[in-house]
């Protein structure tokens, strides 16, 4: 690690996190690393600055934030030799938990200095944008289709800071409980090449990591960033109680099966959606 950029959102985290970021930067400078901090104002700017870091010869880009910031940085450095490093400044920090990155930014900076870069497979989503144009993006943690995706779409970036955490979670719960669970078609290939078609899916998650941290121990048992596929969670029930039972199973670390929820490994998944499920596209491809 010689030449790095640290990308962060100055509107997120408050004064305390800015102080932690400055302390982490000092750790890098004290180790002889050429490091600079770049403030960003939007997801698109994070991705653009990450791409600039690649063209300017940086060997590492630090995502200083949560999983959303990591996602934006990955869009800019995927398929390049530039390494991703993390200073956990977000709310959930799922990828940091899975990688066992220290959650204090200064400790995370020290850990990055002694770490060795390694390649992992990325998930890729191909879809049609809201403007009707073909688009794609990469994901590291998970991708989803259904009510969870609707929730994240509605709870746009920055809402936590505007509403406060209590109001944010209240809004999330209201959206999740009131949004109609519609069925869509999922076709995926199993590791042995067998193609499976499910015509009654109400919720789909494609998960790349094992540990999400916090109270959620395992959302998708069998998922691993060391594999070259995703772990699918297919909910085939319109009952929210079924999905809640499955999530509760992960909260307590239990291994019991939940009727109406299936798990599978796959490298290629195709979803055919009713427009009411997702207004952005009627066809989504997920690859790993």
What are these regions (language model features)?
Residues 1-61, 71, 107:
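ATP/NTP phosphate-donor binding region
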Residues 144, 148, 205-221:
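Glycine-rich phosphate/pyrophosphate-binding beta-alpha loops
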Residues 46, 68-73, 94, 120:
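Short glycine/serine/threonine-rich phosphate/pyrophosphate-binding segments
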Residues 10, 64-66, 89:
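Glycine-rich beta-strand-to-loop/alpha-helix junction loops that act as flexible
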Residues 190, 198, 224-227, 231-288:
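ATP/nucleoside-binding phosphotransfer catalytic cores, i.e., glycine-rich phosphate-binding loops
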Residues 5, 31, 40, 78-83, ...:
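Catalytic core of DAGKc-family lipid kinases
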Residues 26, 148, 158-183, 231-261:
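Alpha-helical membrane-targeting segments
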């Amino acid at each position: 690690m010689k030449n790095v950029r640290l990308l962060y959102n100055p509107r997120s985290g408050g004064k305390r996190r800015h102080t932690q970021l400055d302390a982490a930067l000092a750790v890098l400078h004290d180790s002889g690393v050429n490091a600079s901090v770049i403030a960003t104002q939007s997801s698109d700017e994070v991705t653009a600055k990450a791409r600039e870091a690649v063209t300017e010869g940086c060997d590492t880009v630090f995502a200083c934030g949560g999983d959303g910031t990591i996602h934006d940085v990955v869009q800019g450095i995927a398929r390049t030799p530039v390494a991703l490093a993390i200073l956990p400044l977000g709310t959930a920090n799922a990828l940091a938990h899975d990688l066992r990155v220290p959650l204090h930014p200064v400790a995370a900076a020290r850990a990055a200095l002694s770490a060795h870069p390694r390649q992992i497979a990325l998930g890729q989503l191909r879809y049609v944008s809201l403007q009707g144009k073909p688009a794609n993006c990469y994901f590291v943690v998970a991708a989803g289709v259904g009510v969870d995706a609707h929730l994240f779409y509605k709870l746009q970036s920055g809402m936590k800071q505007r509403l406060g955490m209590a109001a944010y979670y209240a809004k999330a719960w209201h959206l999740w409980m009131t949004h109609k669970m519609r069925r869509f078609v999922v076709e995926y290939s199993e590791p042995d090449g067998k193609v499976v078609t499910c015509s009654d899916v109400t919720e789909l998650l494609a998960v790349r990591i094992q540990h999400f941290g916090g109270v959620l121990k395992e959302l998708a048992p069998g998922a691993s960033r060391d594999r070259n596929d995703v772990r699918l969670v297919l909910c085939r029930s319109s009952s929210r109680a079924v999905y809640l039972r499955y999530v509760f199973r992960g909260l307590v670390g239990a291994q019991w099966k939940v009727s109406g929820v299936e798990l599978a490994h796959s490298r290629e998944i195709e979803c055919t959606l009713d427009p009411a499920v997702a207004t952005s596209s009627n066809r989504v491809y997920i690859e790993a």
